[in-house]
């Protein structure tokens, strides 16, 4: 039975801990010059309905470093649900590659793709969530845990618009038993459906969440996180209107960092619009870990690919006798036939 990674809602806290541990172990090995060929001869199909920098490069590099290959399918090269149905696309690609990743415009597309594919499917981002970012962020927070604290002791504050990254950060922090705050303006906060899912996580993990427009909510934060201000509302608000909503109250500047605390770390999924949601002083400052965070997109994707492929193959083991027979038959054919 194959396993997909469409949302962390289908993963346990323990599984996420394991994914972090695996990812960081592989990272350590590669830093020391050992590239474990855990995906040798494996191929990844990458479907992009939207352009990407970090996601595409991370998946391609991960496959290369671990002995496999990534095939990039650019916007316009493949049409999910266009001329060919999603069902047919997933069935065909399931026979051509070993694992699929898709960055889609609508979440139902990745759900349909995963339901129809016979191989593991990874959500590279949708309009609902960004689960690969979640895993990378979790790896980053584990690496930068405040001295003497466990994950469950940490407070994570997301500042600004309720983007899919904001929701995903809420999902992963509440799943891990952390304390999550969304500090954003009314009308741009996590909605009731989002909050219900965070509450469900908290019931299991013992974590907490708060949605507020109170600026004092950043106080005592271990991690302060922001994203661009134009994510979900680009077509609805002009730049001038966005600035009126978010600036200056929701800009992460040095004053906000100081209010959070001297040891608070700054995070951003990138790309950042410097001068809007964050100042140069903060993003380039000593407490900024957003570039470690960007590196950990690769770190976490390596671990995720290995986990999904190993789990899949463990449940679908190759028949070694048939494999040996096929090898022998091919060798005999090549020895006895000529063109």
From Swiss-Prot:
Q: Which residues participate in carbamoyl phosphate binding?
A: 52-56, 103, 130
Q: How does activity depend on pH?
A: Optimum pH is 6.7 with 10 mM putrescine and 10 mM carbamoyl phosphate, 7.8 with 0.2 mM putrescine and 0.2 mM carbamoyl phosphate, and 9.0 with 0.5 mM putrescine and 10 mM carbamoyl phosphate.
Name the positions where putrescine binds. Answer: 268-271
Keyword Cytoplasm annotated? yes
Looking up Pfam families in the UniProt record yields: OTCace (PF00185), OTCace_N (PF02729)
Q: Where is this site: Important for structural integrity?
A: 27, 143
Give a GO molecular function annotation for the protein: ornithine carbamoyltransferase activity
Q: In which pathway does it act?
A: Amine and polyamine biosynthesis; putrescine biosynthesis via agmatine pathway; putrescine from N-carbamoylputrescine (transferase route): step 1/1
InterPro entries per record: Asp/Orn_carbamoyltranf_P-bd (IPR006132), Asp/Orn_carbamoylTrfase (IPR006130), Asp/Orn_carbamoylTrfase_sf (IPR036901), Asp_carbamoyltransf_Asp/Orn-bd (IPR006131), Orn/put_carbamltrans (IPR002292), PtcA (IPR024903)
- The principal localisation class reads cytoplasm
Q: Where in the cell is it found?
A: Cytoplasm
Query: Per the entry, what modulates this protein's activity?
Result: Inhibited by spermidine. Inhibited by N-(phosphonoacetyl)-putrescine. Inhibited by N-(phosphonoacetyl)-L-ornithine.
Q: Which GO terms describe its cellular component?
A: cytoplasm
Q: What is its EC number?
A: 2.1.3.6
Any one Gene Ontology BP term = arginine biosynthetic process via ornithine
Query: Does NADP show up as a keyword for this record?
Result: no
Q: Which UniProt keywords apply?
A: Cytoplasm, Polyamine biosynthesis, Transferase
Catalytic activity, per the record?
A: carbamoyl phosphate + putrescine = N-carbamoylputrescine + phosphate + H(+)
Superkingdom of this protein's organism = Bacteria
Q: Name the protein family.
A: Belongs to the aspartate/ornithine carbamoyltransferase superfamily. PTCase family.
What this protein is reported to do is described as: Catalyzes the phosphorolysis of N-carbamoylputrescine to form carbamoyl phosphate and putrescine. Is involved in the degradation pathway of the polyamine agmatine. Also has weak activity with ornithine and cadaverine.
The subunit field of the Swiss-Prot or TrEMBL record says:
Homotrimer.
Q: List the protein's name.
A: Putrescine carbamoyltransferase
From what organism does this protein derive? Answer: Enterococcus faecalis (strain ATCC 700802 / V583)
Q: Which gene encodes it?
A: ptcA
């Amino acid at each position: 039975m194959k396993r997909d990674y469409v949302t962390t809602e289908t993963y346990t806290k323990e599984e996420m801990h394991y994914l972090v541990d695996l990812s960081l172990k592989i990272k350590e090995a590669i830093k020391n010059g050992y590239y474990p060929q855990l995906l040798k001869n494996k191929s990844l199909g990458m479907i992009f309905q939207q352009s990407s920098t970090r996601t595409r490069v991370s998946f391609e590099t991960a496959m290369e470093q671990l002995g496999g290959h990534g095939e990039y399918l650019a916007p316009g090269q493949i049409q999910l649900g266009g001329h060919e149905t999603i069902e047919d696309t997933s069935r065909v690609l399931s026979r051509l590659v070993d694992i699929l990743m898709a960055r889609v415009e609508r979440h139902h597309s990745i759900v349909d793709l995963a339901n129809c594919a016979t191989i593991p499917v990874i959500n590279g981002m949708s309009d609902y969530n960004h689960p690969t970012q979640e895993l990378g962020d979790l790896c980053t927070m584990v690496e930068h845990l405040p001295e003497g604290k466990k994950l469950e002791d940490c407070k994570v504050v997301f500042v600004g618009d309720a983007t899919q990254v904001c929701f995903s950060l809420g999902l992963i922090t509440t799943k891990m038993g952390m304390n999550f705050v969304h500090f954003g303006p009314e009308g741009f906060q996590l909605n009731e459906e989002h909050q219900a899912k965070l509450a469900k996580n908290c019931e299991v993990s013992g974590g907490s969440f708060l949605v507020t427009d109170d600026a004092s909510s950043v106080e005592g934060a271990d991690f302060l996180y922001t994203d661009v201000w134009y994510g979900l509302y680009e077509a609805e608000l002009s730049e001038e209107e966005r600035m009126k909503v978010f600036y200056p109250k929701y800009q992460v500047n040095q004053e906000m960092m100081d209010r959070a605390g001297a040891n608070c770390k700054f995070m951003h999924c990138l790309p950042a619009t410097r001068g809007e949601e964050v100042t140069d002083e903060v993003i380039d400052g000593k407490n900024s870990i957003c570039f470690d965070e960007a590196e950990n997109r690769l770190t976490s994707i390596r671990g995720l690919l290995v986990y999904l492929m190993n789990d899949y193959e463990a449940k679908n083991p190759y028949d070694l006798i048939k494999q040996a027979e096929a090898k022998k038959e091919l060798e005999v054919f090549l020895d006895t036939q000529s063109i």
